[in-house]
């Protein structure tokens, strides 16, 4: 893959392997570089360390390549230079997929080179026209064969049946054998061209191939490596510790309601509910889950697509019931209040986050090492924020919903455990 170059830039040819992570075998995503110099996906390295599968001599944060591990756990930060290189590689790959591979830099003093890009649709249409012309040429060639006689048999390329023709052209005649072979070759070429033409026509937008042809076309047409479809979401290491917590009705505020399976919490559309008074009930739009997490590692996911303003996190059971999640010394969360208003709160300290709305949020809690991490979950998990947690009492999954948006809801996903 050639990097797009301009001015005095030097073109560099790279393959996907040059920018891949040995843990997930894919392109680096949010690359991070260890003190030893080796780079990995930030998420992959974090998950590997969490699972302790890469531990060396009791050190869980050893490098997966050189096996070197510092005395203290290094902080993982995105390598912006390496990320920029990956982004440029992906840009060049998209240009190739669109039908125009970037040209190498011109030699010194040479005239500027202009690359005309063509879309995939235009290329397919041009190929279709070329094949159609070839089919017409072959059919024309087929009708211009040597004249061996007249009649329907002659038109089909078979020997004449009259006695005089048999004398002139026996089955052992070299001329007749040569003609029969040529005729057979032409028929094969014509058949192959018509098949290619049919497949190309099926590839043009608006002319989808029949359903029964899809599998055949997939197996017969070879795609370049850069034209592969995106890989499906890889199984996360975090799913090994998956749980599906349920909401605790004792903590539910008066303007919220919970579904029958206790995994969906909704802002009420009508008047406040007349729940029984409880000292555990929140006075603002918040709710805890029943599960008290005190040891080990836990992971759960929350669907946020139907909620415009929300906060997701953990807190100790002793959190004040009139306190906001993240604004107390015993609660931590990420909070979405709209585009450009995404933040993390940890022990009353706010950190602005730069990210689009995560439709599904994954929460990772490692109570052994005191770590909390939030992920945007799609094809892959993308780390949003991580922090240290410390509490002398168990922690509970905790949620806030904007109380003036009736019908908005958050839903805890049922994960396979």
Curated annotation (Swiss-Prot):
Q: Does the keyword Metal-binding apply?
A: yes
Question: What tissues is it present in?
Answer: Ubiquitously expressed.
**Can you quote a single GO CC term?**
cytoplasm
Swiss-Prot/TrEMBL keywords: Coiled coil, Cytoplasm, Immunity, Innate immunity, Metal-binding, Receptor, Transferase, Ubl conjugation pathway, Zinc, Zinc-finger
Please give the catalytic activity noted in the UniProt record.
S-ubiquitinyl-[E2 ubiquitin-conjugating enzyme]-L-cysteine + [acceptor protein]-L-lysine = [E2 ubiquitin-conjugating enzyme]-L-cysteine + N(6)-ubiquitinyl-[acceptor protein]-L-lysine
GO MF terms here are:
ribonucleoprotein complex binding; RIG-I binding; ubiquitin protein ligase activity; ubiquitin-protein transferase activity; zinc ion binding
Known EC number: 2.3.2.27
Cross-referenced Gene3D superfamilies: 2.60.120.920, Zinc/RING finger domain, C3HC4 (zinc finger) (3.30.40.10)
Q: Where is the B30.2/SPRY domain?
A: 225-417
Task: Provide the GO biological process annotations.
Answer: antiviral innate immune response; free ubiquitin chain polymerization; positive regulation of interferon-beta production; protein homooligomerization; protein K63-linked ubiquitination; protein polyubiquitination; protein ubiquitination; regulation of innate immune response
Top EC category: transferase
Q: Which domain of life is it from?
A: Eukaryota
Q: Where is the composition biased (Polar residues)?
A: 143-164
Zinc fingers (RING-type): which spans? 21-67
Q: Name one Pfam family in it.
A: zf-C3HC4_4
| Localization (cell) | Cytoplasm; Cytoplasm, Stress granule
Query: InterPro entries from the entry?
Result: B30.2/SPRY, B30.2/SPRY_sf, Butyrophylin_SPRY, ConA-like_dom_sf, E3_ubiq-ligase_TRIM/RNF, RNF135_SPRY_PRY_dom, SPRY_dom, Znf_RING
Q: What name does this protein carry?
A: E3 ubiquitin-protein ligase RNF135
Can you name the source organism?
Mus musculus
């Amino acid at each position: 893959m050639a990097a797009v170059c301009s001015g005095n830039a030097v073109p560099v040819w790279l393959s996907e392997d040059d920018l891949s992570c040995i843990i997930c075998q894919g392109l680096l995503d949010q690359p991070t570089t260890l003190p030893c110099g080796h780079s990995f996906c930030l998420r992959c390295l974090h998950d590997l360390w969490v699972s302790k599968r890469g531990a060396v001599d009791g050190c869980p944060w050893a490098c997966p390549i050189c096996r070197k591990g510092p005395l203290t756990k290094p902080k993982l930060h995105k390598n912006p230079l390496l990320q920029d290189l990956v982004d440029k590689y992906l840009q060049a790959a998209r240009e190739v997929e669109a039908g125009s591979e970037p040209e190498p830099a011109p030699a010194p003093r040479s005239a500027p080179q202009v690359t005309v890009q063509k879309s995939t649709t235009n290329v397919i249409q041009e190929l279709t026209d070329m094949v159609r012309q070839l089919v017409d040429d072959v059919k024309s060639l087929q009708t211009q064969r040597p004249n061996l006689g007249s009649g329907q048999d002659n038109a089909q390329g078979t020997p004449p049946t009259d006695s005089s023709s048999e004398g002139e052209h026996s089955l052992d005649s070299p001329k007749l054998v040569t003609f029969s072979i040529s005729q057979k070759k032409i028929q094969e070429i014509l058949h192959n061209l018509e098949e290619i033409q049919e497949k190309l026509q099926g590839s043009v937008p608006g002319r989808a191939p029949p359903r029964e042809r899809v599998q055949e076309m997939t197996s017969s047409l070879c795609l370049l490596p850069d034209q592969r479809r995106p890989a499906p979401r890889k199984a996360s290491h975090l799913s090994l510790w998956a749980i599906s917590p349920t909401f605790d009705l004792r903590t539910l505020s008066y303007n919220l309601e919970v579904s029958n399976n206790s995994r969906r919490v909704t802002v009420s559309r009508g008047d406040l509910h007349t729940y029984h008074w409880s000292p555990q009930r929140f006075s603002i739009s918040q709710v805890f889950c029943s599960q008290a997490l005190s040891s080990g590692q836990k992971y759960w996911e929350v669907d946020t697509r139907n909620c415009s303003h929300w906060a997701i996190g953990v807190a100790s059971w002793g959190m004040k019931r009139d306190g906001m999640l993240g604004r107390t010394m015993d609660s931590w969360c990420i909070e979405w209040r709209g585009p450009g208003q995404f933040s993390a709160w940890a022990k009353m300290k706010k950190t602005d986050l730069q990210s689009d709305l995560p439709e599904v949020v994954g929460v990772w809690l490692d109570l052994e090492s005191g770590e909390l991490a939030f992920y945007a979950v799609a094809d892959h998990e993308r780390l949003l924020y991580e922090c240290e947690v410390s509490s002398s009492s168990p922690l509970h999954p905790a949620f806030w919903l904007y109380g003036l948006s009736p019908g908005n809801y958050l839903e805890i996903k049922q994960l396979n455990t």
